[in-house]
Amino acid sequence: MAHITSWHYGNAIALLVSLAPGALSLNTFPDCSSGPLSKLAVCDTSLDVTTRAQSLVNAMTFEEKVNNTQYNSPGVPRLGLPAYNWWSEALHGVAGSPGVEFADSGPFSYATSFPQPILLGATFDDDLIKQVATVVSTEGRAFGNAGRSGLDFWTPNINPFRDARWGRGQETPGEDPLHVSRYVYHLVDGLQNGIGPANPKVVATCKHFAAYDLEDWNGVVRHSFNAEVSTQDLSEFYLPPFKSCARDARVDAVMCSYNALNGVPACADSYLLQTILREHWKWDEPGRWITSDCGAIDDIYNGHNFTTTPAEAAATALNAGTDLDCGTVFPKYLGQAADEGLYSNQTLDRALVRLYSSLVKLGYFDPAEDQPYRSIGWTDVDTPAAEALAHKAAGEGIVLLKNDKTLPLKAKGTLALIGPYANATKQMQGNYEGPAKYIRTLLWAATQAGYDVKYAAGTAINTNSTAGFDAALSAAKQADVVVYAGGIDNTIEAEGRDRTTIAWPGNQVNLIDQLSKIGKPLVVVQFGGGQVDDSSLLSNPRVNALLWAGYPSQEGGSAIFDILTGKTAPAGRLPVTQYPADYVNQVPMTDMALRPGSNTPGRTYRWYDKAVLPFGFGLHYTTFKISWPRRALGPYNTAALVSRSPKNVPIDRAAFDTFHIQVTNTGKTTSDYVALLFLKTTDAGPKPYPLKTLVGYTRAKQIKPGEKRSVDIEVSLGSLARTAENGDLVLYPGRYTLEVDVGESQYPTASFTVTGKETILDSFPQPPKTR
């Protein structure tokens, strides 16, 4: 097994090469029992976090301080402070990265590989997300305790999936801000083991702050891209997941992004990092720190031309609130910047105290016997329970897009398994992956399911060669049923690689069409994070069933065949809109606006209504009937709603109401059901009105045939409110309709009225007039 899997900060590879040897050396815990460090207050566990960290920083020389502002911090040998690599990754499992060292074999040569976040998002299962994060943090802590990773991990990616062309959309849970916000809340809870714990298991890092969702599109690259975003869209769409992460889940780290926001590079933007993040969201507790994305501080000078020298770039980022450089600008140029009087010693100390306060909270300087997480080890990695959870997560996320009752497959027999994913392994992991103990391929799973399998790749992901068609068609003719497995992969979508088309690549649709003409039942399994236009498959009556499986990782093949054979009933929902292929010709990727314009059609399900398949779509092997016990709700009054809200939580998180629906399984198959609750209005607040807005969801588990289940969906005041042009969150009086989207065009509704006056729930900080 490879020493370290590929990691995907593609443009940072040259940066790594330029750093001193030892970037992949094992981390070690400091010795606080003897030696020079033991004489410092940082080793005194009776003191508060800040005092301990400050004592360490006070003991450093200026040069030592500057040297330790980079991600691959060399430590201070003179003080007995070991080197520490801050850059460890764990997007969907401990992942290959400069701070993580996998062994060649044996212990610590692999970790559990969960589905990519885009497939986890399709589960709409908050409890599952926390369970996955808990396992990831346990395994991350095991690697950290063994000196094979840091104790902080640069995950999750919570930029909403705005544009289907984005190469990193696979790393996110979807396009809806509420959904992404709930995802990150439960994920951070699981990773850090609590909401703002005094002693986190690991430190999570929410990225990329903010308005980052472009890699390289038609020559426009992330390192110099200026995202022009209205204050309304910033507050309503781009920032809510970060508010949930920082203010509500109380994450300990945030990463600022490559792009500029309205002319100011994110890592140099005090409006973002100080005014919004640290002040408005009150993200100011000890041990909260900000890292740049890798090379982003260099981009301030080289990409954005925001400063005239790299020393100015270093000082500008430090003054704005960036504490750590994933790069070399800080250690190379902060000395020069100090000589030029561009920042104060107190500002440098502030950054280092934040960083080392984080390590103090993690127990890095404490005796191992006093730290509950230091006992976590190799036996806690990839346990049978973790493998079962990976299987469950993949199965819960898979979405059934089409089915003419061909699925579930009725019997064994001969099965033709065709396509570039038919025997895929690492391909099913997506990016930011680590070595897995095993990866269950579709070919393996089909054999395990008892089928006589005729396998042929047929074609590749993106080729016009038809050399494999004959073998594929021959296999299909010999079979009772045909399963085609294809879609897109990291050669099409990845970090540094956006798409220019959202059609199926290469000649895959051509092969599927030829397979459909053979006359055998044909099932298509579509892989990839971003959606492709399935119009031709949906309209072809000879394509009998269609599934979307995202990147299901190590349990992919077995989870998919559990769905195909009916062992598991599909209940996932699309976490994004599937756009027609021509959509890319209607709006440039650089257009950050969500609402329709004079020449643009709008983005996401809230503003675009011509989807091939809408956000939240998903079929089942059974049928459900939805009813409202009460069709007439309320009325509600704005003043009463605000006055009854508890004072110890932000008012936008306060409860509006809990809505009860009856879900009856009217079919013959036990199945989960994801209840998605949308809100509509045509008179509450100013125009334009969104088509609908997700305000709540829940996943009801294992509803049996004939069973009637009462399902409760909680809605917050913030979900009821709308965002004004100046970014304020406003509760408007008016008439509202609630709609349950059940995926089969049945939309039971209930209505209510809100009376009273317009009420501001959150006054959004206004950007500086000089921007």
Curated annotation (Swiss-Prot):
A GO biological-process term: arabinan catabolic process
Pathway: Glycan degradation; xylan degradation
Presence of the UniProt keyword Signal in the record: yes
Catalytic activity: Hydrolysis of (1->4)-beta-D-xylans, to remove successive D-xylose residues from the non-reducing termini
Protein name stated in the entry: Probable exo-1,4-beta-xylosidase bxlB
Principal subcellular localisation of the protein: secreted
Stored InterPro entries: BXL, Fn3-like, Glyco_hydro_3_C, Glyco_hydro_3_C_sf, Glyco_hydro_3_N, Glyco_hydro_3_N_sf, Glycoside_hydrolase_SF, Ig-like_fold
Signal peptide location: 1-25
Record's keyword terms, sorted: Carbohydrate metabolism, Glycoprotein, Glycosidase, Hydrolase, Polysaccharide degradation, Secreted, Signal, Xylan degradation
EC number: 3.2.1.37
Active site: D293
Molecular functions (GO terms): alpha-L-arabinofuranosidase activity; xylan 1,4-beta-xylosidase activity
PANTHER family listed in its UniProt record: BETA-D-XYLOSIDASE 5-RELATED, SUGAR HYDROLASE-RELATED
Any one of the GO CC terms: extracellular region
Organism: Aspergillus fumigatus (strain ATCC MYA-4609 / CBS 101355 / FGSC A1100 / Af293) (Neosartorya fumigata)
Function: Xylan 1,4-beta-xylosidase involved in the hydrolysis of xylan, a major structural heterogeneous polysaccharide found in plant biomass representing the second most abundant polysaccharide in the biosphere, after cellulose.
Organism superkingdom: Eukaryota
Family as reported in the entry's similarity comment: Belongs to the glycosyl hydrolase 3 family.
Keyword Glycoprotein part of the UniProt annotation: yes
Subcellular location: Secreted
Glycosylation sites (chain numbering): N67, N305, N345, N423, N464
